Amino acid sequence: MSDKVKQLKWLIVLFLFLLAIPSYFAYNHFRQSSALKEAFEKNERIEVLHRLMASEKYAPDIRKAGYVVPPDGAIRLDGGIDSIEIKGDIDLDISNPGRNGVTAYFRIEIDGKITSVLYELDKNFDLVSSAYFQINEKNIKESVTIPKAEEERLLKIVQKELEDFMETMYQTLYG
């Protein structure tokens, strides 16, 4: 009789242990998902981008929302999503955010030449720094300047695209 009680106790312990493992992973998944939603609701843009791009977890959702990310194999190899392509008024690439901001890259035509544009944006998507490059006649990349009004116009487009991205992702995830 005592052997059966011991055996029952061991089965209960084993069952609880086996139940604890999936419970831990389910809790961890819920906690990560709620942290992303909380970042969305607090309008912490850099935190949202960081969480969306930290792994392949949200890649299918980003694709479903109509944005372009690398293939899952490349994401696993890189340890996260290195860039998201946003097709809109301009074709914008945003990189995995740093601690305080995000980099936006796009190409436009200025004065009949293709110009590569690089914007460093802070947590509010305000401009921290900008760089403009064109390929000259000798196939050498050279820095160019653009009028302040043009820079402000482009910045507004970039900010609108990023805000639309954030809104679309929130609707896709929590709709």
Each model region followed by its residue ranges:
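N-terminal export/targeting and maturation segments
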Residues: 23-105
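A general marker of short, structured functional hotspots
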Residues: 20-23, 54, 63, 161, ...
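Intrinsically disordered, low-complexity segments of exported/surface proteins
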Residues: 6, 14, 28, 106-110
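Extracytoplasmic electrostatic interaction patches
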Residues: 82-175
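Sequence-pattern detector for short linear motifs
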Residues: 7-12, 34, 156
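Hydrophobic membrane-insertion alpha-helices, especially the h-region
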Residues: 9-25
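Short, Lys/Arg-rich N-terminal segment immediately upstream of the first membrane anchor
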Residues: 1-7
